[in-house]
């Protein structure tokens, strides 16, 4: 299905392209802290921490900031205690929405995320109310200018990837969650430069939005959720046709 879906192409580059560098740094620091807390400070033995540190370096984060975040996670330095929490619910036109957050105050975060849902005509539901509509996948983004789809297909499938999809500017390589790091390494060993590699939630089916007002409400809600300080990632199952996106983007 053509059009603009929340998990396609451009959204995956948001963290590295976001002009609000302070917000990007905050999110990465929280991820480093949690990863170090859960899996220890050794990058070789902690894939999640290794990925977070790679993201930090790609965003030009100073090495001292990275080191301090790791030390806070392992308890060597004092700092805020962050928890991971996921909210599920429905947005405009009954689209399914999942919001992953990291927070040092669950009550505050819940109140603020709920307000975004309700202000756009949506509602937060109970755990599991929409997540069954999605599958967790590893996703690797590769610039289309660096390799052809055919060449990438051969390398990626041999490396253990599940599927490949080419968007307008990037190739998307999908993997099982546990295979993400392995496939990424295998691609890079073959000389394939990856732009990002992350875990994501892919909807089983998409809801096509053909009404301009509904599309506008959805995009405003997505932007507000994306921009919230505690938000780590937002997933949804909407698909807005390109012609509608062009109209509401003017």
Swiss-Prot record:
One of its GO terms (molecular function) is DNA binding. One of its GO terms (biological process) is regulation of DNA-templated transcription. Keywords: Cytoplasm, DNA-binding, Transcription, Transcription regulation. GO terms for cellular component: cytosol. Pfam families: TACO1_YebC_N (PF20772), Transcrip_reg (PF01709). Gene3D superfamilies: 1.10.10.200, 3.30.70.980. It is found in: Cytoplasm. It comes from the Bacteria. InterPro entries: Integrase-like_N (IPR017856), TACO1_YebC-like_2nd/3rd_dom (IPR048300), TACO1_YebC_N (IPR049083), Transcrip_reg_TACO1-like (IPR002876), Transcrip_reg_TACO1-like_dom3 (IPR026564), YebC-like (IPR029072). Belongs to the TACO1 family. This is Probable transcriptional regulatory protein Emin_1151. It comes from Elusimicrobium minutum (strain Pei191).
């Amino acid at each position: 299905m053509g059009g603009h879906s929340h998990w396609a192409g451009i959204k995956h580059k948001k963290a590295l392209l976001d002009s609000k560098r302070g917000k990007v740094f905050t999110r990465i620091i929280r991820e480093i802290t949690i990863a170090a807390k859960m899996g220890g400070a050794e990058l070789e033995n902690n894939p999640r921490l290794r990925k977070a540190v790679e993201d930090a370096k790609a965003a030009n984060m100073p090495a001292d900031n990275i080191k301090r975040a790791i030390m806070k996670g392992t308890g060597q330095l004092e700092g805020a205690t962050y928890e991971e929490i996921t909210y599920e619910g429905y947005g405009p036109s009954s689209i399914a929405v999942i919001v992953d957050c990291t927070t040092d105050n669950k009550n505050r975060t819940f109140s603020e995320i709920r307000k975004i849902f309700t202000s756009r005509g949506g509602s937060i539901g109970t755990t599991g109310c929409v997540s069954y509509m999605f599958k967790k996948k590893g996703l690797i983004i590769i610039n289309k200018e660096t390799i052809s789809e055919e060449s990438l297909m051969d390398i990626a499938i041999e490396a253990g990837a599940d599927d490949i999809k080419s968007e307008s500017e990037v190739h998307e390589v999908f993997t099982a969650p546990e295979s993400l790091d392995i496939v990424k390494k295998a691609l890079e060993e073959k000389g394939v430069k990856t732009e990002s590699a992350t875990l994501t939630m892919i909807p089983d089916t998409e809801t096509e939005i053909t009404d301009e007002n509904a599309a506008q409400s959805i995009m405003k809600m997505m932007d507000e959720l994306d921009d919230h300080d505690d938000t780590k990632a937002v997933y949804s199952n909407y698909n807005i046709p390109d012609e509608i996106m062009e109209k509401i983007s003017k």
